[in-house]
């Protein structure tokens, strides 16, 4: 008898039940690893699988995380370049793709990443046909559309991380200006994740008090307090971080874990994430943009209808037209 057999006797006859809350992260770059560690530290899954084409980097990252198993409550951490390792995932987070270069717009990345998705998405679908797909790679709105098309999944099982992070940046900056915690500053950024995102000034409130009610000029050129600059900081924020440290990682990783938590814990929380917005806010084309959505066990179950001012609605339509202009040129 082996030491293990002397120590432990097996009671159960049938095969043990596999993972119930398995999460896969595709891509072990900066964003993938920040997402992975954020998910692990929030105890959201009972198995974490990681996939990447860079075998040595993948193996090293998996080992490094496994070495911390004692400090985690996720029993199984695995990784392989073969997608069979992802089988039966409840949720798959796609962070893989070409990295945004300094000064490069998110839209410029697009065809490079479409080609990568043509390999990734069918492999995910093959091994986890019932999973929820969360796209994080940029440009996220277009790539969420691409993932939806390539996967054949119903729209409630495909979402993009969208403006969840933009809204978090927005709330942080508003909090700085008012000396409040971001969670007490209720504010939404919708539309494109990136340069044409739309701040909903009309909905900005603290404890139910509308800030635009106190300052009707808020968000306009004529505002003496120049609140509009905050949105510019949100848009420039990512470029600034990329310029300073070469990439963004921590905030997007935490944002991803925030979304994963709402889904796996069936929280029915409302998040600004990327979904099919055709028919909403006057959008005619088949595009994905961020609007407030309810997230739970089944994925993206509902959309909240925001009351937008005419100019806010126009900005959403402009975003949609920009994205459609790029999308219709894509070869899928």
Swiss-Prot record:
It catalyses: (S)-lactate + NAD(+) = pyruvate + NADH + H(+). Coiled coil: none annotated. Pathway: Fermentation; pyruvate fermentation to lactate; (S)-lactate from pyruvate: step 1/1. It is an enzyme of class 1 (oxidoreductase). It holds the Pfam family Ldh_1_C. InterPro entries: L-lactate/malate_DH (IPR001557), L-lactate_DH (IPR011304), L-lactate_DH_AS (IPR018177), Lactate/malate_DH_C (IPR022383), Lactate/malate_DH_N (IPR001236), Lactate_DH/Glyco_Ohase_4_C (IPR015955), NAD(P)-bd_dom_sf (IPR036291). The active site is at 193 (proton acceptor). GO terms for molecular function: L-lactate dehydrogenase activity. One of its GO terms (cellular component) is cytoplasm. PANTHER family: L-2-HYDROXYCARBOXYLATE DEHYDROGENASE (NAD(P)(+)), L-LACTATE DEHYDROGENASE A CHAIN. This is L-lactate dehydrogenase A chain. It comes from Eleginops maclovinus (Patagonian blennie).
């Amino acid at each position: 008898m082996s030491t293990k057999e002397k120590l432990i006797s097996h009671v159960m006859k049938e095969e043990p039940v596999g993972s119930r809350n398995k999460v896969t992260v595709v891509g072990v770059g900066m964003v993938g690893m920040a997402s992975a560690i954020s998910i692990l530290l929030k105890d959201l899954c009972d198995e974490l699988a990681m996939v990447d084409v860079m075998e040595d980097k993948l193996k090293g990252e998996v080992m490094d995380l496994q070495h911390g198993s004692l400090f985690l409550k996720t029993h199984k951490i695995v990784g392989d370049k073969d997608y069979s390792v992802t089988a039966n995932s409840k949720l798959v987070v796609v962070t893989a793709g070409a990295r945004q270069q300094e000064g490069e717009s998110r839209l410029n990345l697009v065809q490079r990443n479409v080609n990568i998705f043509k390999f990734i998405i069918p492999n995910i679908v093959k091994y986890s046909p019932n999973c929820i797909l969360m796209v994080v790679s940029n440009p996220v709105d277009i790539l969420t559309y691409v993932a939806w098309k390539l996967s054949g999944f119903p729209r409630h099982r495909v979402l993009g991380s969208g403006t969840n992070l933009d809204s978090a940046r927005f709330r942080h900056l508003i909090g700085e200006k008012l000396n409040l915690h971001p969670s007490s500053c209720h504010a939404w950024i919708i539309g494109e994740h990136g340069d044409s995102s739309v701040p909903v000034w009309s909905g900005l409130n603290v404890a139910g008090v509308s800030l635009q009610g106190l300052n009707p000029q808020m968000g306009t050129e004529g505002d003496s307090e120049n609140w509009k600059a905050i949105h510019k900081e949100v848009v420039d924020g990512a470029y600034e971080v990329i310029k300073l440290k070469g990439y963004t990682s921590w905030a997007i990783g935490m944002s991803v874990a925030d979304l994963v938590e709402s889904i796996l814990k069936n929280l029915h929380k409302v998040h600004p994430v990327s979904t099919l917005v055709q028919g909403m806010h006057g959008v005619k084309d088949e595009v994905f943009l961020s609007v407030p959505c309810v997230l739970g066990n089944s994925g993206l179950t509902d959309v909240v209808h925001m009351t937008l001012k005419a100019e806010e609605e126009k900005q959403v339509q402009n975003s949609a037209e920009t994205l459609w202009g790029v999308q219709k040129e894509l070869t899928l």
